[in-house]
């Protein structure tokens, strides 16, 4: 167990000025970060089910990449008994466990040096539709992770969650208007100003804007639940053939955009369709295990924003969520077809979905750089 004190060196320049860029997820990784789930007003049974699931996710990742887990001091002893022994536990305060959204975006340069971008965070909407209050500890998470690795830090003047962007490492950024242009994130910035900031801090050139994310996604339509890059020039889209499903118009509109765009290198996109599970709904038993607090209520009968697109690429592995016995095998087969050179590892992940996200949402990769 190690301790991360907040003291990452802050830079006054921007990554693009310094020759740094965000690499694609399939670039070599030195580590993956996760955070211990414990909020009783978001995770049933005070997080016990989620903790067991996080342990399985950490174990699956650990077969390919070292795993770090931020854990509040009060839960360190418990985490040590639950987490696989190969996971490095780091004492770290947080308001919840969404490492993708509160962790840093690590950027690299041609020499293999790593630095981190620390974005603003307001719990997916602040006092205008945000998911909990306060979020002050979450605002310190990125800095603590960067300190652990000894990386210098860029502080970006933009409210942004890591789950709201995907890049191909070759100049293209994909995102959703539902999230990035939402009035509860950066109401004083225009679309053009947001793009300029993403150019500065991700060093990208071209943007692919999808309108909406997955139906009922409480993050306001994060791209990482809806669509991702498989490799340069190829994307994977969350899909349903059921035209009566509320998801259909969202996926169809996204497909129309993807079919009529090019990436930063001028390539037309090859589009893979990954079928949605379910539809899936929260049960009464699952909702009763969540206590009342400042978190968003978990209501029986509420549709869950389940998506197989919410997977992690980590070195030679794809770690994806198992969500529905009727479609899990189809998703695994499709992923193996898309990624023949990768080991496809499924982890039962309904407990993460009940809390509002999935495997990509609870992980944040640290690229190797070199």
Curated annotation (Swiss-Prot):
UniProt record, GO biological process: putrescine biosynthetic process
Superkingdom per UniProt: Bacteria
Reactions performed catalytically: agmatine + H2O = N-carbamoylputrescine + NH4(+)
Active-site residue list: 361
Keywords of the record: Hydrolase
Broad enzyme group: hydrolase
Similarity-based family: Belongs to the agmatine deiminase family.
NCBIfam families assigned to the protein according to its UniProt record, in alphabetical order: agmatine_aguA (TIGR03380), PRK13551.1 (NF010070)
Protein name: Putative agmatine deiminase
Organism: Shewanella baltica (strain OS195)
Taxonomic lineage: Bacteria, Pseudomonadati, Pseudomonadota, Gammaproteobacteria, Alteromonadales
């Amino acid at each position: 167990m190690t301790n991360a004190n907040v003291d990452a060196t802050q830079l006054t320049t921007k990554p693009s000025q310094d020759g740094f860029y965000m690499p694609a997820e399939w670039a070599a990784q030195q580590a993956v970060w996760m955070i211990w789930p414990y909020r009783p007003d978001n995770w049933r049974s005070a997080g016990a089910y989620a903790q067991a699931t996080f342990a399985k996710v950490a174990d699956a990742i650990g077969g390919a990449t070292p795993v770090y887990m931020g854990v509040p001091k009060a839960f360190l002893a418990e985490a040590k008994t639950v987490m696989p022994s190969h996971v490095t536990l780091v004492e770290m305060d947080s308001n919840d466990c969404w490492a993708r959204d509160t962790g840093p975006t690590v950027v690299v340069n041609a020499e293999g040096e790593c630095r981190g971008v620390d974005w603003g965070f307001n719990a997916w909407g602040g006092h205008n539709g945000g998911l909990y209050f306060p979020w002050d500890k979450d605002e310190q998470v990125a800095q603590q992770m960067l300190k652990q690795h000894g990386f210098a830090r860029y502080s970006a003047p933009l409210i942004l969650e890591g789950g709201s962007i995907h890049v191909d490492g070759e100049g293209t950024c994909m995102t959703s208007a539902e999230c990035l242009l939402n009035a509860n994130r950066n109401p004083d910035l225009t679309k053009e100003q947001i793009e300029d900031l993403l150019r500065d801090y991700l060093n990208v050139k071209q943007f692919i804007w999808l309108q909406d994310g997955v139906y009922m996604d409480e993050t306001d339509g994060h791209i990482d639940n809806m669509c991702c890059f498989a490799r340069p020039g190829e994307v994977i889209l969350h899909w349903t053939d059921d035209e009566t499903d509320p998801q259909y118009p969202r996926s169809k509109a996204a497909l129309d955009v993807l079919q009529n765009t090019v990436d930063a290198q001028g390539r037309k996109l090859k589009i893979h369709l990954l079928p949605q599970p379910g539809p899936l709904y929260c049960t009464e038993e699952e909702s009763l295990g969540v206590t009342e607090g400042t978190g968003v209520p978990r209501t029986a009968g509420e549709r869950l924003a389940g998506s197989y697109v919410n997977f992690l690429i980590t070195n030679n592995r794809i770690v994806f969520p198992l969500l529905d016995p009727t479609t899990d095998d189809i998703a695994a087969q499709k992923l193996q077809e898309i990624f023949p050179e990768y080991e496809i590892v499924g982890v039962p992940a309904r407990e993460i979905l009940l809390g509002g996200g999935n495997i990509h949402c609870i992980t944040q990769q640290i690229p190797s750089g070199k």
